[in-house]
Regions:
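Structural motif
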Residues: 9-13, 55-59, 96-103, 146-151, ...
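Blade-loop segments of beta-propeller domains
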Residues: 11-15, 20-45
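Asp-box/WD-like beta-propeller blade repeats and closely related beta-sheet repeat scaffolds
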Residues: 35-39, 51-100, 112-121
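Short coil/turn segments at the loop-to-beta-strand junctions that recur within blades
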Residues: 26-34, 72-78, 117-123, 164-170, ...
């Protein structure tokens, strides 16, 4: 497992599947192979790519954590993905103007194309994890609290869109453009939206977190027939529930994360193995792995 720790430490690490620490990638600093503010990463057979937003560069490590090289990029970006053809796609940090939201570069980080300009005045304001996420259908591109998700092909070109219809609970357009200002102006926040890029568990089964400003729900849905079910997170929720899904292998396995913060927020915490409780009490987080089983009549 590869994890970008977005706590104050902001480090990139990897673990074996049994939880054994494996490697740390880079460190805080200004030198080669060092980052100031790692914001996103991508992993494939060629290594680990870390996007350092503040320094406007991409650092490339091999699986063992050794530095391969780094490249400067001439823009601020929130997300990175290496494409099948060896080129890269970046989601650009919005600045209120109609700059492109997607910039494509060659393997040396030279811009070669762009698409999907932001709406005039768009500044975002809501941090989204997993802006680019792989699925069996293609590469999913999503920024919260938008009500649409773009599916890209292997070269990063838009194929189709999935629209999320929350009816009268949909986020107003003003909030989609500037979420921070929308909240600061004391507008109601009783609107539903995805917290992060939803996760494809199989071709037709997706999972994600939604919130309405007061409550959090785990939603399982089929985006192609509008069928869905949601479970509200309350003190009656079990620690073994899928509370914060973060990753799937797209074959029925979903990985979620739990932390010590859940101790007084849900039940069954004391039923965790002592080794897990001790690890959580020491400030660690734990990955919870769930497997969906599908039965045919």
């Amino acid at each position: 497992y590869y994890i970008l720790d977005k706590s104050s430490l902001r480090t990139v690490v990897s673990f074996k599947k049994d939880g054994t620490p494996d490697t740390k990638y880079g460190r805080i600093g200004q030198g080669p192979g060092e980052y100031v503010f790692p914001w996103d990463m991508d992993i494939d057979e060629t290594g680990v790519y870390v996007l350092d937003t503040n320094s406007k560069k991409v650092i490339h490590y091999n699986e063992s954590g050794n530095l391969i090289g780094e490249r400067k990029i001439p823009f601020f970006a929130d997300a990175i993905k290496r494409l099948k053809n060896g080129n890269f796609i970046f989601n650009i940090t919005p600045d209120g103007t109609q700059i492109p939201s997607l910039i494509y570069t060659d393997s040396l980080m030279n811009p070669i194309w762009n698409s999907r300009p932001y709406q005039e005045g768009y500044v975002g304001g809501y941090t989204t994890c997993g802006i680019f996420r792989n699925s069996n259908l293609g590469l999913c591109f999503y920024r919260s609290p938008s009500d649409s998700l773009a599916i890209l092909d292997e070269n990063g070109k838009v194929q189709t869109f999935i629209v999320f219809d929350f009816l009268d609970k949909s986020v107003p357009q003003i909030a989609k453009i500037d979420y921070i200002a929308f909240n600061q102006n004391n507008h109601s926040i009783d609107y539903l939206h995805f917290v992060n890029n939803p996760i494809s568990v199989t071709d037709s089964l997706w999972i994600g977190l939604i919130e309405d400003g007061h409550n959090q729900y785990t939603i399982i849905f089929n985006p192609f027939n509008n069928k869905c079910g949601a479970k509200k997170f309350t003190k009656t929720s079990s620690i073994y529930d899928i509370i914060e899904p973060i990753f799937s292998d797209n074959k029925g396995t979903i990985v979620s994360v739990i932390s010590q913060e859940l101790k007084n927020k849900c039940k069954d915490y004391e039923l965790l193995p002592d080794t897990i409780i001790n690890a959580l009490n020491d400030g660690n987080r734990v990955l919870l792995i769930n497997k969906f089983h599908f039965y045919r009549n």
